Curated annotation (Swiss-Prot):
This is Ribosome-binding factor A. Keywords: Cytoplasm, Ribosome biogenesis. Gene3D superfamilies: 3.30.300.20. Pfam families: RBFA. The lineage of its organism: Bacteria, Pseudomonadati, Chlorobiota, Chlorobiia, Chlorobiales. It is found in: Cytoplasm. It comes from Chlorobium phaeovibrioides (strain DSM 265 / 1930) (Prosthecochloris vibrioformis (strain DSM 265)). It comes from the Bacteria.
């Protein structure tokens, strides 16, 4: 990733986080923009979001984000239009790293428990 795309991705991550926090306050699961990856031509930005909640809440939140993508992009455009000629298309993807880490911790705990019981 070039220096420019890194700067753009960082700015988009900050702005998307602020938009989701201020413009779309929800009483549901905790939602965090973890990372934004942007194509070299700055035409597409993939925002990876971490959603802490149960399976149903995560599915509803992803559906909400996908339904609101155009509105979120419009709000984003109004905030950063003076910095870019063209605002990238947005795509939201769920970042499952937190869930995977929790599962690994759970497995490690069970292994420790079993090895402690067998000794």
């Amino acid at each position: 990733m070039s220096r420019r795309t890194e700067k753009v991705a960082s700015l988009l991550q900050q702005e998307l986080g602020a938009i989701l926090e201020k413009e779309y306050p929800r009483g549901g699961p905790l939602l965090t923009v973890v990372e934004v990856k942007i194509t070299a031509d700055l035409g597409l930005a993939r925002a990876f979001v971490s959603i802490i909640g149960n399976e149903e809440e995560r599915a509803e939140t992803m559906e909400f984000l996908n339904d609101e993508t155009k509105n979120i992009r419009r709000i984003l455009s109004s905030k950063i239009r003076h910095q870019f000629r063209r605002i990238p298309e947005l795509e939201f993807r769920e970042d499952l790293l937190y869930e995977k880490a929790s599962r690994i911790e759970e497995l490690l705990r069970s292994v420790r428990k079993e090895s402690g019981e067998n000794e």
